[in-house]
Amino acid sequence: MSTAEMRAKLERAREAQARRFTAGDRMDCNARIPERRFRELCAMEAPAEALFLAALRSLKVSARARGHIVRLARTIADLEGSDRIAERHVAEAVGYRGRDSR
């Protein structure tokens, strides 16, 4: 992927985030999504949610790390142009988090 292609992909992801947040939100990117809004703003497909819950059990991550995984999966989905978080997005996010998330 060229630099120009990557830049365009990132710009589309940022545009998706801008559309997601309303004027009254105190958020401008996925990193600022509060946990109470996860269900609304970070909708997961059923297989993605199953993988997420299985990963939480097996990795025994902290509550804070759980939030990081959800936000990261949302960002990965945005980079792909996906409205919902898919299983592959969760798998990638969990892979980035690794075992250092305890």
Give the predicted meaning of each segment.
Residues 1-102:
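Basic, amphipathic alpha-helical bundle interface domains used for macromolecular binding and assembly
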